[in-house]
């Protein structure tokens, strides 16, 4: 899984490098073609490092880092067990309740925050009605591209996981793949599978059962969620920096609004990481690492030297991220909830899902 994590991080870094190079290419070409343009380029760099810009740099980086720190907030509010406790009846029920809230938060984040913001930009940037309609169709296309990208990534890495431990002689693999229902696994079935697993522990492709269990301990859905969060934090960094470019007051208000929106969202993301196999501290550290996306986004917005330049980037990143969040919520998390057989637990999960959406509605109106 380390190679997979490095590949995901490398992919995102490559996207950022290409985006930065694409923005700097026209400037460098103009600078090499004539002397006056070269002087304008030097003047623009001087403006970038002026005292006003320096204030925007400092405030934007601090604001983006504060937004990233919200990733460790779930440690303060979720006294959640890990390891074997997740496979118990009570632990499974609590995890599914958190996952229900996470689905509501993700759906509310997509349809009440990300897509409306991208829609508002396309409407304001369009010159005519025909152009506005074309940009709105492009917005929907980016949502589909984001969904399919996350589908392709999971298919690629899922095949590699199955090759590492195909399960020949590993009877214990079946119960490891899913969270038990609210009623728990029947004790006799679990005991029987455990005995067969011990008997065949040395027959899993020449390696022990413990090594197979370790290889599949972290699900790819956890890394996909981290990738989506990194891109989401990149857009937050763009918004924070663009606001500080307008004024310090607007920047502080924007930072506070994003923080209020991120807290319930991070709680849901934390539950998804626990479901993927991370322990509490590893999940918090991985959530904190996504703050780098916000810092990169803030630097990108300030180097664009205008809120409009940041807005053009947001116009396609927001719907792309929305597609990724939709994939995580509907494909990776919802199937676990559909396995619930207890009617009372199912009702609780639906109520918590609605609670997550309600929280996002309240934050969207503030």
Curated annotation (Swiss-Prot):
Record topology, Cytoplasmic segments: 27-57, 119-137, 247-282, 335-343
Where does this chain carry the motif XEXPHE-motif? 261-266
The protein's location, in the record's own words, is: Golgi apparatus membrane; Cytoplasmic vesicle membrane; Endoplasmic reticulum membrane
Q: Give GO terms: molecular function aspect only.
A: zinc ion transmembrane transporter activity
Coarse class of the primary localization is Golgi
Q: How does it sit in the membrane?
A: Multi-pass membrane protein
> A GO BP term, please?
zinc ion transmembrane transport
Enumerate the InterPro entries for this protein: ZIP
- A GO CC term attached to the entry: endoplasmic reticulum membrane
Q: Where is this region: Disordered?
A: 183-205
What reaction gets catalysed by this protein? Zn(2+)(in) = Zn(2+)(out)
Would you identify the family this protein belongs to, as annotated?
A: Belongs to the ZIP transporter (TC 2.A.5) family.
Q: How does it assemble?
A: Homodimer.
Reported function: Functions as a zinc transporter transporting Zn(2+) from the Golgi apparatus to the cytosol and thus influences the zinc level at least in areas of the cytosol.
Q: What is this protein called?
A: Zinc transporter ZIP13
Source species: Gallus gallus
Q: Its encoding gene is what?
A: SLC39A13
